[in-house]
Amino acid sequence: MLLSPSLLLLLLLGAPRGCAEGVAAALTPERLLEWQDKGIFVIQSESLKKCIQAGKSVLTLENCKQANKHMLWKWVSNHGLFNIGGSGCLGLNFSAPEQPLSLYECDSTLVSLRWRCNRKMITGPLQYSVQVAHDNTVVASRKYIHKWISYGSGGGDICEYLHKDLHTIKGNTHGMPCMFPFQYNHQWHHECTREGREDDLLWCATTSRYERDEKWGFCPDPTSAEVGCDTIWEKDLNSHICYQFNLLSSLSWSEAHSSCQMQGGTLLSITDETEENFIREHMSSKTVEVWMGLNQLDEHAGWQWSDGTPLNYLNWSPEVNFEPFVEDHCGTFSSFMPSAWRSRDCESTLPYICKKYLNHIDHEIVEKDAWKYYATHCEPGWNPYNRNCYKLQKEEKTWHEALRSCQADNSALIDITSLAEVEFLVTLLGDENASETWIGLSSNKIPVSFEWSNDSSVIFTNWHTLEPHIFPNRSQLCVSAEQSEGHWKVKNCEERLFYICKKAGHVLSDAESGCQEGWERHGGFCYKIDTVLRSFDQASSGYYCPPALVTITNRFEQAFITSLISSVVKMKDSYFWIALQDQNDTGEYTWKPVGQKPEPVQYTHWNTHQPRYSGGCVAMRGRHPLGRWEVKHCRHFKAMSLCKQPVENQEKAEYEERWPFHPCYLDWESEPGLASCFKVFHSEKVLMKRTWREAEAFCEEFGAHLASFAHIEEENFVNELLHSKFNWTEERQFWIGFNKRNPLNAGSWEWSDRTPVVSSFLDNTYFGEDARNCAVYKANKTLLPLHCGSKREWICKIPRDVKPKIPFWYQYDVPWLFYQDAEYLFHTFASEWLNFEFVCSWLHSDLLTIHSAHEQEFIHSKIKALSKYGASWWIGLQEERANDEFRWRDGTPVIYQNWDTGRERTVNNQSQRCGFISSITGLWGSEECSVSMPSICKRKKVWLIEKKKDTPKQHGTCPKGWLYFNYKCLLLNIPKDPSSWKNWTHAQHFCAEEGGTLVAIESEVEQAFITMNLFGQTTSVWIGLQNDDYETWLNGKPVVYSNWSPFDIINIPSHNTTEVQKHIPLCALLSSNPNFHFTGKWYFEDCGKEGYGFVCEKMQDTSGHGVNTSDMYPMPNTLEYGNRTYKIINANMTWYAAIKTCLMHKAQLVSITDQYHQSFLTVVLNRLGYAHWIGLFTTDNGLNFDWSDGTKSSFTFWKDEESSLLGDCVFADSNGRWHSTACESFLQGAICHVPPETRQSEHPELCSETSIPWIKFKSNCYSFSTVLDSMSFEAAHEFCKKEGSNLLTIKDEAENAFLLEELFAFGSSVQMVWLNAQFDGNNETIKWFDGTPTDQSNWGIRKPDTDYFKPHHCVALRIPEGLWQLSPCQEKKGFICKMEADIHTAEALPEKGPSHSIIPLAVVLTLIVIVAICTLSFCIYKHNGGFFRRLAGFRNPYYPATNFSTVYLEENILISDLEKSDQ
């Protein structure tokens, strides 16, 4: 009897040991496939053929055939490796990294739990990799390389099972991804679970411990695709379509797209006005903008639905911009607007709607019939194709004239129903030398709905880039098709174009297809499937598949073959060999030659993460995604075969070889034998770095594209080109055209210029990086995936025979060559040395100076290529006086020389001599300056690499109470009594009386000094700037340094009332309140507003010739700040040595988690004057960073965008800014700290359950499920009362910060929510409804006049700015309910430590007792679940009732049956 997969999982993973010991069982191939489908695998040593087994304290290698649950592994969140049997994660202990590896709690902060797989190696942080010791224990080491494979997969890579984020649905975390593993009910779950739910729905936690954080959501359930619409979908009974409204989620477009796909659905597509009205009615009470599947992420096509639905109905907002440079390439639907469709940046985070058909007729069925060959007969002058006849009319007419002309000929304007018909149209237009034609598609409706003129259904669309472009205020729109790709464009119907008529033809018998029996025809070829499984060598021999395996030349032929193999696919894992191979392991895939000349690769159609490696052969996939290509082992793998031969009596096409002799135009570069030219656009030559799409558009302005590599030789040239321009130590990154943005491309990487992908460019390290859809190139032949919205330099590519366009904004310059921060101009004509000195000076440059061997090599390589007959070139060396030493003419010192020592210098006192460089040897010599030679000019970068030296200042003294900093005195004034806090005018008056002004902050270090002194304060401080002249400080100095908040209030378009906005002087504050502005940031506020501190400055007193004590006394090695202890280590050391040195001092390498401590360390580092190591590091080339002490924090302080990409370990420079570099680099010091102790929660209360979900903060519970509901103030107040709660009140800054953090996840979907405030007529003040005063308030520019509050205005919170605003009470807004949490007396459970930690005996005995009790309890639970539930003290996931007709049940948190029974 066969066991089900779920029962197999139970048997292998085993019940708890108290009930039944997990039995060892042989892993058959069938069982292994079942585990691998779940992402579970066994790790086998490739060389030793043994498998890793997790023991109680160490990992060992054991016989794979005696496999058990302790050999089962799974990739989990944050690049963790989870052991199923040991229920722990593989960890690396920094304090003893080369001890045997062990399992740890999966949220342990004591070790590193992050691992990467790359080229069959498992690598951890600091270049440690998983190795095997002599005693078969598994260790981490940096000395050797050990390769690991997945047991039972034929040498497969464990990277094939990398974890992919699973974004939750509904729940209470706004669509955050599941955290695997997560702990619930004292067990670690590595996948979604149904445990604790009566409705049997899958759920997961989004943090590592559910009981602690209560953050959760439902899992996308792939099985729901088989059962139709379950309880988290809503069904439209008229259309039999299901919709899932994820209105409380906040995901990027690609994340939302993935979430829908995981459930067997797609992002919303809207096919007609009826469907749009259904969606609008369902969201009528919401003011929300949601993602739908509309996108233009295919670089070669226009707008499309992500589910492939034809796009013929549109309801664009008039605001939509169709310009090519606009980054908004994903579509949204707004329920509150009549023209509801907009375009947004795809990286924005929004709610989304999924859609799933119950009885959808797959378009592939229609496509399959469209590719079937039908021999057709037509009248003379008409072109036959698959049952129809077509005629191109070469007389230009308007669309309506063309329509009438076809009708007069008993035909109709052409309708296009499939990609097969597009192929015919492209061929017909090409044969007739026509570039564009009318087709029968048009619209005369608002909203736009395109229809065919013959009334046939629109089942296929093929829009051109940026189309369909809807013209405003024009009801009649007509459509044309262009020749190159057959794409469609919206046109003015009055334009005059050629047109094609179409009518039915006469179908002939199949015998006239021209193919042998059993073969199918497409174009000029016949195709057949050999269904016998063979190796590639057998299939490609020409015997079984005469004359050869199939070669595929374009997307039309691929679509035909996909339809062909769909008819024979019977098995789950069927594959078909094609002729593509790399059997010689060259690194480049080519078509296996038949005869002498190989066929060029013109098209590829890879599956996700393919080609996975070099040296393989290619098979086409027979299951979803159907038709995609994958690399397989040429000899061991067996597949069916796809055969191809020309139609009988048809000549085989000859491929013309084009030899690219045309030179590159302007300053584009190439080398002999390459068909394209390249140009590097680096930051020294352009105004700004750009996103991937901006860079592609930039290249397109020249008629080019981002660079692609058609052959390995092109990649080698680009690599050398970068090496020739930049220092090899620079970690520069350049956008190239490699991307996987197109959602219809199955996650496959492609080139933006449609160059076929012929090599395995990306390491399998990045297979799990789904969100990074664009690639950069580094000068070490490395491609790295990044977010497409990142800004980088870029490389463009253009064919040799295409002359680049010159954009209007392009400033042409003579072709200077860039090399390492300077540019060089090579003058090939000969002249005297003095003439060239003048020419170079006129070009704002100097005659060439050479200061290094690298520069010498660069110059020699260039002049050697440019010179004829071994010419010598003038350089900037001149003998200033006869027989004197040679000096550089620009005055720089001669620090490098390359004289020809074998050449005698001629002594001639009568004439001056100048230096030259030989193009043959590269050696220097001297000659009379009047001799004519070619020469080189050199110009340096315009910016200086170091600051100008100021005149030394004298240290002085400051009055008592003032702080000395940087030659001036500062006074920080924040009285303890809030009633003494000042407005800006009073603060400036106070400073003036003290002989100073409000502070002028002149540098980042001074900013840090002030910020560090604000630690513990809760109010912001006035500084010396006003909005009427924010470029000049109050003391008259220009603003050379600024630190404005991104939410600076001066940029906010509207405030409380129109009157408030008029004539309000604004003054600058430095924030010490992170609730509304980032710590230390500047923002404007009403100058007259009281309630702030201030900072004064005045000049130091130098009359006493004071001495700065910081110059006299060294910085102490131990420093205290903000409840932390820091230790400064002064020694040359690597990052690894810094880790060990800190441990020796009973500390750890520092982690920095907020701006206050960062500011303190900035001041310290500036005082020390050199860089220090900090505890940040990366194991994945800068994609993720971790703190070595296990601290989790989102705070960063990078120098710039690229500073995080220059190495694996991080240091802070003398200005406190962070840079990454190689971990083996030596720095002069490191900063250690003693990590603060973590406390248990001070608020153990829990939230009661009603019909809406709650999130706990401190001793209160909040429901955010109503923020998208639009209700009046009174209706919202009544709703909360019915739930036993009240409308939102905000009592302190911590609560305010919590609320803004939670609301931030809603993005732009929520603008305002009601606050539970009222007007007290007795004393004319605003109070909370419970009677307490509104001590915590934030009215923005000015508190409103209470006259406006009587009697029809209420208070709302503006989410984007965190400001309060008066609004009419009858307006409809979202709201938040709030109530006090219930008292919960259960004690917190202790955390589990590492499995090999040394534990005191008493604790060990206690744990043994606990384990025994838990084991016994589990057995009792299996036999008597009711008894166990009565004993339970933990929280189970439970819904009071499963009913999703209301949004309020979207986020019910998980409660226990025990609590339910008490309600």
Curated annotation (Swiss-Prot):
GO biological process terms, alphabetically, are: negative regulation of arachidonate secretion; oxidative stress-induced premature senescence; positive regulation of arachidonate secretion; positive regulation of cytokine production; positive regulation of DNA damage response, signal transduction by p53 class mediator; positive regulation of podocyte apoptotic process; reactive oxygen species metabolic process; receptor-mediated endocytosis
Alphabetized SUPFAM superfamilies for the sequence = C-type lectin-like, Ricin B-like lectins
Give the protein's recorded name: Secretory phospholipase A2 receptor
A GO molecular function assigned to this protein is: signaling receptor activity
Signal sequence span is 1-20
The task this protein performs is described as: Receptor for secretory phospholipase A2 (sPLA2). Acts as a receptor for phospholipase sPLA2-IB/PLA2G1B but not sPLA2-IIA/PLA2G2A. Also able to bind to snake PA2-like toxins. Although its precise function remains unclear, binding of sPLA2 to its receptor participates in both positive and negative regulation of sPLA2 functions as well as clearance of sPLA2.
Task: Give the location of motif Endocytosis signal in residue numbers.
Answer: 1436-1442
- Whose protein is this, by species? Homo sapiens
Segments on the Extracellular face: 21-1397
What phylogenetic lineage does the species belong to? Eukaryota, Metazoa, Chordata, Craniata, Vertebrata
The record comments on the domains as follows: C-type lectin domains 3-5 mediate the interaction with phospholipase PLA2G1B. The endocytosis signal probably mediates endocytosis via clathrin-coated pits.
* Spans traversing the lipid bilayer: 1398-1418
Give the CC-aspect GO terms. cell surface; extracellular region; plasma membrane; receptor complex
